[in-house]
Amino acid sequence: MRVLSRFIVAASDARHFPGEDLPEMAFLGRSNVGKSSVINSLLGHKIARTSSSPGRTRTINFFEVRWPGRPKPQIIFTDLPGYGYAKVLREISQHWATFIEPYLTKRASLALCLVLIDSNIPPQNSDQQLMDFLRAVGRRLVVVATKSDRLSGNQLASSLQNLSRTFREPRLLAYSAKTGMGREQLWQEIRAAAAAFSEQRALPS
């Protein structure tokens, strides 16, 4: 699916967040897990900045997404700071209470959390802690196993089984930004979350 997209804002404080009119899809994960590459792959062009340096993103970056032929955007992608590297962990933790935690706990337009994990390494405690936190605050989530093209069929099956058993998450998708593996399945999850958000908004208050 080809879509149109535009960068909106890089927010380093909750006061800089845009309005909450559209459903938002948050991309979370360890540093260098490939969040920006997954976003660029989904959108079909390079809009999120990629870097080989861990922890490059220090802000929540908002991108509006519009279906072709539609005059207005339909959803928002948000790229959150990565975690897991000691040299950036202190800086991220300093900002957690300022804008990351308020975004994940209080943002009314947050429709789906996409937790990206590297399929090539064992399950990490930091990923488990994030998922436990998201479940505790009632967030809808899907786990995306990135860089899946680097594994053979048997290796990938074993990795997914291990990740599913560890994280106890039924919605687990193998993804490759390089080959496009899992792209349509992930779009299905995003569209379903957007539809659920719209239905919830339509209910009488």
Task: Give the role of each language-model region.
Residues M1-Y85:
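Conserved G1/Walker A P-loop phosphate-binding module
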Residues R2-R15, R150-S205:
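Canonical P-loop GTPase G-domain recognition
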Residues R15, K46, Y85-V88, Q124, ...:
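Conserved protein kinase catalytic core
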Residues F17, T57-F62, I75, P81-A111, ...:
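Switch II of P-loop NTPase G domains
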Residues D21-L22, N40-L42, R90-S93, Q128-D132, ...:
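Short, glycine/charged-enriched secondary-structure capping and boundary segments
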Residues R56, G82-G84, N120-P122, K147-S152, ...:
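Conserved nucleotide-binding/hydrolysis micro-motifs of P-loop NTPases
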Residues F63, T146, L186:
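Residue-level signal for inorganic ion chemistry
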Residues F99-R171:
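Conserved C-terminal guanine-recognition region of P-loop GTPase G domains, centered on the G4
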